[in-house]
């Protein structure tokens, strides 16, 4: 991976605390993506309350995840953890019959040093169901890194690209008890090495990105994760991999070091500009010249004209929450917005090198100043800077949204960008809808004169409701 960072982009680091969801929230979208999986979160009542409230799914709906609640006997080592987990997994196999069970470790399992990795192989052999262990706990920087941890663990179970002659396939059969689906070649593809895309996206977005690459005669050999555990892609020497999300640096490192794959360092397909750059970075690797991307991007920008007129000249401040701030900021700058600061809990500068380069090029193209990038920002310092800058919009975690709104700054929850469909050419309108909603609300309240806190000319004033 390239380690060169553009010199004109300055990266600062403060000593702030992490203000983010717990990474076990990754269960909320991964259990829907991997359709034959079952997630077992090993934690305390607090973890259960969080999942119950964050996911909004009642237990009566029988979702494909559950809590293995630790009791006082587990903490004091009076109970046999192996037997307790075995009982739960046998019940899960009987009731839900999953192809894979994924144990999610929490802060408590880290503190009491529960040997989940040691118990999983033995229990896997006993019950005949693959068991993966992912420690997606609150020690991470951001909640999106829960997915990164799960995918990194899952990459170890992907079959090898080529099995040596005469080697037994017993291991592969054990890990993948279901036959792999045969692919149908409906399009004549270019002759190129295998390409695997990693990152969890809804099925419709997977189809969209597959279609975009198919138009360039590039065949996607598989996705990590796949919809079914048995359909995990083959990995190994000579396989090229490319990510779709900025928070998957741990997975990228695993694919490079452990599976010997070649990483394509590309910007991320968020927004029309990012999607075009993502495809343009993949094509030359396989000796293919990208076609018709510029015209495609221009058509998308033309269709967004009504939104662009609304956001052009507006300012935005990223407090930092989910590790996709760089990509969203780059897209908003391309839309004509002014980005004062990009706060981000953590950034792998090698994995996001191409995204940083695209950010700089976008600022130059739009004649915008390069925003300040602050890693691990201190919220107190950020609030002081916001008081001076008075941005039109702050993209922040939920904890700071209401206090900032009371001070006349429009806010948008950063978590909404995580769960919204923001990838590909076709979903740029959804991103702008999220951004413009608080801007339109503030303008409407201003026109109605029915709010007690409205900002005009960067000053707060109190208005009396119309009787």
From Swiss-Prot:
Location of the protein in the cell: Plastid, Chloroplast
> Where is it chiefly localized?
plastid
One GO molecular-function entry: ATP binding
Record note on cofactor = Binds 1 [4Fe-4S] cluster per heterodimer. The cluster is bound at the heterodimer interface by residues from both subunits.
Q: Does the keyword Coiled coil apply?
A: no
Which InterPro entries does the entry mention?
LIPOR_BchN/ChlN, Nase/OxRdtase_comp1, Protochl_reductN
- Primary enzyme class: oxidoreductase
Its recorded reaction(s) are: chlorophyllide a + oxidized 2[4Fe-4S]-[ferredoxin] + 2 ADP + 2 phosphate = protochlorophyllide a + reduced 2[4Fe-4S]-[ferredoxin] + 2 ATP + 2 H2O
Cofactor(s) recorded for this entry are: [4Fe-4S] cluster
Its subunit composition reads: Protochlorophyllide reductase is composed of three subunits; ChlL, ChlN and ChlB. Forms a heterotetramer of two ChlB and two ChlN subunits.
Stated family:
Belongs to the BchN/ChlN family.
Q: HAMAP family from the entry?
A: ChlN_BchN (MF_00352)
Record-linked PANTHER family? LIGHT-INDEPENDENT PROTOCHLOROPHYLLIDE REDUCTASE SUBUNIT N
- Can you name this protein? Light-independent protochlorophyllide reductase subunit N
Protein source organism: Pinus thunbergii (Japanese black pine)
Q: Which gene encodes it?
A: chlN
């Amino acid at each position: 991976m390239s380690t060169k960072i553009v010199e004109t982009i300055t990266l600062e680091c403060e000593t702030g605390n992490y203000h983010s969801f717990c990474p076990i929230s990754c269960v909320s979208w991964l259990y829907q993506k991997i359709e034959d999986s079952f997630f077992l979160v090993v934690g305390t009542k607090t973890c259960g309350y969080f999942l119950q409230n964050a996911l909004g799914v009642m237990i009566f709906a029988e979702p494909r995840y559950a809590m293995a609640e630790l009791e006082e006997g587990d903490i004091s080592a009076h109970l046999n953890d192996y037997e307790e987990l075995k009982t739960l997994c046998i019940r899960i196999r009987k009731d839900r019959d999953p192809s894979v069970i994924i144990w999610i470790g929490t802060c408590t399992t880290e503190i009491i040093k529960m040997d989940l990795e040691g118990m999983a192989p033995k229990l896997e052999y006993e019950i005949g169901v693959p068991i993966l262990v992912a420690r997606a706990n609150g020690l991470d920087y951001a909640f999106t890194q829960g997915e990164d941890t799960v995918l990194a663990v899952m990459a170890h179970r992907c079959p090898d690209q080529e099995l040596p002659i005469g080697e037994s396939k017993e291991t592969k059969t054990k890990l993948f008890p279901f036959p792999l689906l045969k692919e149908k070649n409906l399009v004549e593809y270019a002759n190129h090495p295998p390409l695997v895309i990693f990152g969890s996206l809804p099925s419709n977005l997977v189809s969209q990105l597959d279609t975009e690459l198919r138009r360039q005669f590039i065949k996607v050999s598989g996705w990590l994760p796949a919809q079914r555990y048995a359909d995990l892609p083959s990995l190994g020497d000579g396989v090229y991999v490319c990510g779709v999300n900025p928070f998957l640096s741990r997975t990228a490192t695993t694919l490079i070091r452990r599976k010997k794959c070649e990483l394509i360092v590309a910007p991320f397909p968020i927004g029309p500009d990012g999607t075009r750059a993502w495809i343009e970075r993949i094509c030359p690797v396989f000796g293919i010249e990208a076609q018709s991307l510029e015209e495609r991007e221009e058509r998308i920008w033309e269709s967004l004209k009504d939104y662009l007129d609304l956001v052009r000249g507006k300012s935005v401040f990223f407090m930092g929450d989910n590790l996709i701030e760089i990509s969203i900021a780059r897209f908003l700058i391309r839309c004509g917005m002014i980005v004062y600061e990009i706060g981000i809990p953590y950034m792998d500068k090698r994995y996001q090198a191409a995204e940083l380069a695209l950010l700089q090029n976008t600022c130059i193209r739009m004649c915008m100043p390069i925003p300040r990038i602050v890693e691990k920002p201190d919220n107190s310092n950020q609030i002081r800077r916001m008081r001076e800058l008075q941005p039109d919009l702050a993209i922040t975690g939920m904890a700071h949204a209401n206090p900032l709104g009371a001070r006349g700054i429009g806010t948008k929850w950063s978590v909404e960008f995580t769960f919204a469909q923001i990838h590909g050419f076709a979903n740029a309108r959804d991103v702008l809808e999220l951004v413009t909603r608080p801007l339109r609300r503030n303008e409407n309240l201003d026109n109605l004169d029915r709010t007690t806190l409205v900002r005009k000319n960067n000053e707060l004033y109190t208005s009396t409701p119309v009787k």
